[in-house]
Amino acid sequence: MPGDEQRERTADDAVTEPSRIARLIAVVAGIAGVLLCGLVPLLPVEETTATVLWPQGVGADGNVTELTAPLVAGAPRALDVTIPCRAVAELPADGGVVFSTNPAGGIEAGRNGMFIRANADVVYVAFRDTVAAVAPREAVDSGACSEIHVWADVSAVGADFAGIPDASGTLPVDKRPQVSGVFTDLKVPAQPGLAARIDIDTRFITSPTLLKTAVMVLGLACVIGSIVALALLDRGWRRRPARTRGRAGLWTWITDTGVIGGLLIWHIVGAPTSDDGYNMTIARVASEAGYTTNYYRYFGASEAPFDWYQSVLSHLASISTAGVWMRLPATAAAIATWLIISRCVLPRIGRRVAANRVAMLTAGATFLAAWLPFNNGLRPEPLIAFAVITVWMLVENSIGTRRLWPAAVAIVIAMFSVTLAPQGLIALAPLLVGARAIGRVVTARRAAPGSWRPCPLAASVAVVFVIIFRDQTLATVAESVRIKYVVGPTIPWYQEFLRYYFLTVEDSVDGSLTRRFAVLVLLLCLFGLIMVLLRRGRVPGAVSGPLWRLCGSTAIGLLLLILTPTKWAIQFGAFAGLAGALGGVTAFAFARVGLHSRRNLALYVTALLFILAWATSGLNGWFYVGNYGVPWFDKQPVIAHYPVTTIFLVLAIVGGLLAGWLHFRMDYAGHTEVADTGRNRALASTPLLIVATIMVVLELGSMVKATVGRYPVYTVGSANIAALRSAGDSCAMADAVLVEADPNEGMLQPVPGQRFGDYGPLGGEDPVGFTPSGVSEHLEPEPVGTNPGTPNSEGPVDKPNIGIAYAGDTGGGYAPEGVNGSRVFLPFGLDPSRTPVMGSYGENKLAAKATSAWYQLPPRTPDRPLVTVAAAGAIWYYEEDGSFNYGQSLKLQWGVHRPDGTYQALSEVQPIDIFQQKAWRNLRFPLAWAPPEANVARIVADDPNLSEDQWCAFTPPRVPVLQTAQQFLGSQTPVLMDIATAANFPCQRPFAERLGVAELPEYRIIPNFKQMVVSSNQWQSAADGGPFLFIQALLRTEAIPTYLRDDWYRDWGSIERYIRVVPQEQAPTAAIEEGSTRVFGWSRGGPIRALP
């Protein structure tokens, strides 16, 4: 209107001219900040170089020794080998290995490595089972060639028998071999011409040069100076009064207390996330590795451009690795996010909204319901959620106060969010939604020269270059990204719907009822508010601009998720803050909508009931140990034997019918509003509050019940409580897992004086159908399947992921003859000279049965709680909930051996088995089940089933002295902890990586069988650049019997011992020559080999 324009013109005339100095600083510092920060990716860095030379000394016999040097990247940057041809003549006539980069006894040694082999006829050089050059053995031995020269680098791969015509060749560069050391059968002393040089790929081990550091410091100083100058310029303008926030009311304080209290409880008892172990291990090894290496995959590539958060975690881990300490950033982000919602977001949307107690309580309940299922771990979503809500607040501050410095700070925070993880892009959503309003603020200052306006904002964007490239270069970050796309898994943008599909998958953590509810409520609030705004134009009592921008930020954020290369449902956790704010406004808006129309209220309640029905069709599932003791973790919730999902679905149908009746009734009765009474206002405003509170109570109650109800049996909550009580000195699951250090020591001995047949005391007097070799040669277990969307799995996205595996040495086979004539390969390190075997495999004509001799039980002590039996085949057992698993009967019978030499048989007990399989495992018989007078026990086996797949085998009973995993492993032994287990074993040391070479682990800690098959073994695979790349080349495994204290039915996981294929004495760890070189940001040095 003309009057308004006149007043605005008068106000502009009254504006004080901003300081020329401040404007000059804003322009110059902004431009300098952009240029300096933009140069950071290209500036030189100091790259640490590492080289292994061979030979490195001689053995006791005076001959060269082998070396162990497992390269994290697999292939070296360059390999150069020369072998004098006369040295080949020292091999036997049938030949041997002249030189290899993998030991011949390793898994797929030739497929991955380089071998120079000699046989009786020829000498050949092969890279990854592809021959590069071959020469007659006679010509090589006779001295027709001077040397064998082999090379492999980023430009060429080849071999040459110098002096022999047509005995050379080259191969494509993708044939560069894996190097895990230097291995040879040659028995020769060090001599001229016998040499190998391995240049390790250390491109990611970089540190900024003095020049780069100075440029980064100056660039950040310029950015800060530009923003400060912008703030001073903002002060120089007479602006509209900002919308003032009243003092927080009583219900705000009450809600703050409830939300923060719930978050603190969840900090102690809450379930971990699927990537806690992943990020924990990366953080723990980063310091020695020299960069944030991807420990479990991708050939040791850097985590850049998303690595600054792991750097923070690395500093935290240097203080303590206890879960309650490492999860502090997530809990702090949660508290800060909520306080911004309650003190800034809701007041900005409307003072009446913030003062409405139902809106405030609903915001708190919805926030908790959205936060708890996703954000209680070491993943980046908690920080992203905080960044999103902070950016929205700053954007609103900039728009409301007509100042630009809050927008500049918002951009900086958004840049930190973007570099947290790909889903951090959603922090850009508030900036995109508010860009038009901020643009009007910029153009409104037409009294001042316009050239300075975008400079501070552009400088804020340029900070992203410093965050990403602070110690990496443009080339190394590009290479890291390339490897991750080559290896995968990645999902294209047009399959974004899979993220939502994963929420619907049953028997999946991502499809759990709590995560379904959080996302469905977010979508209901978003689309519900948009419908109200489109239908009515505004929400009475709320400011339309901020409300539209809140909805727009959420919608744009969901669209930005399309750009992420992965589609894990857990990434929805980044919307937890927005969900809380939307929940509060939805309760406020729909209270008025419900009062306006009974039909609309019925539709609102029906939608919530349908959400509950859909959500409760999933499991109350949590990741790994988070399930321990939780009700309904493996099935849909039930009440009085009725599925809860059915109850809510029936109620939703009733609500829908009621809404339909009210809709058609309007044609006859006309529009009727609901009486504005306290009761009706409560009915209209509280449905979402009630529903969200139910879900929060379920989440908190489930975990508190698990912690209290199972105490002192292991749970996440009990581990965290122990950490708090011991000031972080407890060792979580390592204090609860019990280990048989030597199964042979716990083996029971038969009572002397008994009679038994040819098969010894284990077979008893007259076994039928059971023999010492009655075990199948192949004990491959049944395939294990998991549904689509399983985190850290590379299975197909549209169908179940199927895998087959068994632990250590439990897969069967043959071995030298044992104590009772058995030729069965024994698991768990059992000594065949002391361990007899009896089995019914192959007996398909008679009902097999056997009763062993009586074995003497030792005195009962706390460290010997179990009788265990190593067994194989199909065995009858009951699970803890009473469900039955079919197999053949293998029982333990208690007895009494009296002084007069007689025996009294007592009760028989079925074993505890952890899951159906044929492979060797340890059956458990708690001594608490034994009658007090029992002092002997025997095995009673009965196999009447003649089917080929129905048989059982067993070894003598054991009563081992058990020690904790912490006592067994200690805190200095190098260990491979799988992704799922790493966060639960904070005291164990992950094997180190230094100068691009991995330390060989001595043990592996594995999660439960299903998790191992469908996640660990796939994600950490050799083909994808995981630790199995060198482990399968250099180590073999042996399973160790373990149990979870007082939770004997639990398949918690297992521990495996690694045994070197080539002993340490024969192939000691290589000495590495360390150096440094200066490289510029564009220097690539060739690609890392990231192919299968």
Swiss-Prot record:
Region of interest called Disordered, as start-end residue ranges on this chain: 772-798
GO-annotated molecular function: arabinosyltransferase activity
Keyword Hydrolase set for record: no
Stretches that traverse the bilayer: 21-43, 214-233, 249-271, 324-346, 353-372, 382-399, 404-426, 517-534, 541-563, 568-590, 602-624, 639-661, 682-704
Keyword Membrane applies: yes
Enzyme class: transferase
Cellular localization per UniProt: Cell membrane
UniProt entry keywords in alphabetical sequence: Antibiotic resistance, Cell membrane, Cell wall biogenesis/degradation, Glycosyltransferase, Membrane, Transferase, Transmembrane, Transmembrane helix
GO CC term (a single one): plasma membrane
Pfam families in alphabetical order: Arabino_trans_C, Arabino_trans_N, Arabinose_trans
Topological relation to the membrane, as annotated: Multi-pass membrane protein
A GO biological process held by the record: Actinobacterium-type cell wall biogenesis
EC code(s) of this entry: 2.4.2.-
Function of the molecule: Arabinosyl transferase responsible for the polymerization of arabinose into the arabinan of arabinogalactan.
Family affiliation: Belongs to the emb family.
Miscellaneous comment in the UniProt entry for this protein: This is one of the targets of the anti-tuberculosis drug ethambutol [(S,S')-2,2'-(ethylenediimino)di-1-butanol; EMB]. EMB is a first-line drug used to treat tuberculosis. EMB inhibits the transfer of arabinogalactan into the cell wall.
Record's protein name: Probable arabinosyltransferase A
Organism (species): Mycolicibacterium smegmatis (Mycobacterium smegmatis)
Encoding gene per record: embA
